[in-house]
């Protein structure tokens, strides 16, 4: 069913289709839906798309390049930022496309993610000072969120409030 939804969104002018992700955190016994935020201008700063839900036409890779294998932690963010900055056409389908568990490579080494984030941001025209500031801000924000997630009841309550606003 998920593949049919992706196929329906792929009109001839669309290069990339993204959807939503069922995020599973087995350690904290949590499940919630993470939506791809189609705030594409932010791609040069942060990954606003749920990368496992992104389906890319082969022609997009041929036009704008492949993953930069010199990056280890945020090559997906680099790729999507590059595609966007070079004119790729993104489409969003408001459906859960994949289920994903917490604990990927980018969760394991915040310092390396920060360093690569500066590289990707500056490649996409962000001044280095702004890239560093935004990276530090995001690091503090993620620590706060992680602390809240450790408090299951509070996280469930806050997530319920957020869901009601959307």
Describe the predicted segments one by one:
Residues 25-26, 32-120:
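Conserved nucleotide-sugar donor-binding catalytic segment
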Residues 16-17, 91-95, 130-132:
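A short coil-to-beta-strand element that immediately follows conserved catalytic motifs
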Residues 6, 73, 149-150:
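A short, hydrophobic/aromatic-rich structural module that often spans a beta strand
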Residues 9, 120-124:
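Alpha-helical structural signal in soluble globular domains
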Residues 23-29, 50-57, 125-138:
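Low-complexity, flexible helical/coil segments
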Residues 125-166:
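Membrane-proximal basic amphipathic "stem/tether" segments
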Residues 5, 71, 129-132:
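Short, surface-exposed helix-loop/turn micro-motifs enriched in polar/charged residues
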Residues 1-31:
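Conserved donor NDP-sugar-binding/catalytic core segment of glycosyltransferases
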């Amino acid at each position: 069913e998920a593949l049919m939804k992706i196929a329906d969104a792929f009109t001839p002018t669309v290069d990339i289709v993204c959807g939503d992700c069922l995020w599973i955190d087995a350690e904290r016994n949590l499940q919630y839906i993470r939506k791809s935020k189609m705030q594409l201008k932010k791609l040069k700063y942060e990954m606003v798309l749920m990368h496992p839900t992104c389906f890319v036409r082969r022609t997009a890779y041929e036009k704008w390049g492949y993953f930069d294998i010199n990056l280890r932690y945020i090559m997906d963010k680099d790729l999507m930022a590059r595609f966007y900055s070079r004119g790729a056409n993104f489409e969003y389908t408001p459906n859960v496309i994949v289920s994903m568990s917490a604990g990927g490579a980018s969760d394991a080494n915040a310092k390396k993610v920060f360093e690569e984030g500066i590289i990707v941001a500056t490649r996409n025209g962000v001044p280095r000072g702004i890239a560093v500031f935004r990276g530090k801000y995001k690091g503090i924000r993620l620590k706060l969120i992680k602390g809240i997630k450790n408090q299951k009841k509070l996280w469930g309550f806050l997530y319920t409030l957020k869901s009601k606003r959307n």
